[in-house]
Amino acid sequence: MIFTSSIGAFKPSLEIGAYNISKLALLGLVRNVAAEFGPSGVRANAVCPGLVKTEFAKALYEDPKRAKIAEGMTALKRLGEPEDFRGVAVFLASKASEYMTGQAVTVCGGSNMWA
């Protein structure tokens, strides 16, 4: 199982607190599914994206000032694109990750290093 959480799970927010809390709760679900169903061969992991250019985040990246701040917070100095997550999802779905469960993989251009 591959769940989509967020780097928001790892830090508080005064603007989107309920969203971040829900993403942290999802990581709890991932770990519990991994523990409960692991003996049956079920693996559960989460992908935790940073700011990605999607419809959901449009208000952030379409505002040049906010986009520049967000880009500046990443080591790669750019915002994520939906395509940036394909490889991680393919890896988590493949045999290459067959001994991996209960984990949260961040894909955030390095922005979570500062959390």
Task: Describe the role of every protein-language-model region.
Residues P12-I16, I21, G38-P39:
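Active-site "substrate specificity/gating" loop of NAD(P)-dependent dehydrogenases
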Residues A35-P39, E98:
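Alpha-helical segment proximal to the catalytic Tyr-Lys
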Residues S6:
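Residue(s) in the substrate-gating loop at a strand-loop-helix junction
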Residues R43-K53, A93-A96, T106-C108:
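Conserved SDR Rossmann-fold cofactor-binding beta-strand/turn motif
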Residues T74-F85, A96:
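A conserved structural motif in NAD(P)-dependent oxidoreductases
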Residues L27, C48-A59:
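Short, flexible catalytic-loop segment of classical short-chain dehydrogenase/reductase
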Residues K11, V90, T101-A115:
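Short C-terminal tail/terminal secondary-structure segment
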Residues S22, V30:
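Active-site helix of classical SDR
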